[in-house]
């Protein structure tokens, strides 16, 4: 199964989702992380890292790994508009890469100047989203960071210690403004 937190987006027709019981939700995620680290399957340890990212998101922290939406993944809404992800909000920015109904050849959209402009906007996107569709590809791409965390915390779990939920920002060359709402809004 996959875990998620509330996100606001045009696609969800929501822009007012708020977690009112943050402490309770984060405590539940912390318990889930402890259970996942006790598993014998490495995939569970990486899910624990992902869930730590959800805690970070709920607490309003800076996105731990960069977002590469529009390069690693995309989203097509029901009317054919192609976006880098489904978590865009008008209050920050929202620009489509193209429309699959108007331009039936997807590669024409994907390789277009407009798509590149959107990717440039993603590089500076202030949202700190942490959704499986955008977090998983960068967890694979920059695997040394989640791997180091997973191994260290699996060892802690085996010693009967709690996970270290450091929630640090991993600098992998991304724009320092990306994923940090605190700097702009």
Task: List each model region and its residues.
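Flexible mid-to-C-terminal extensions adjoining Fe-S/redox cofactors in radical SAM and related proteins
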Residues: 81-82, 86-185
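Radical SAM enzyme [4Fe-4S]-AdoMet core and its adjacent flexible, acidic
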Residues: 1-69, 73, 77-78, 82-83, ...
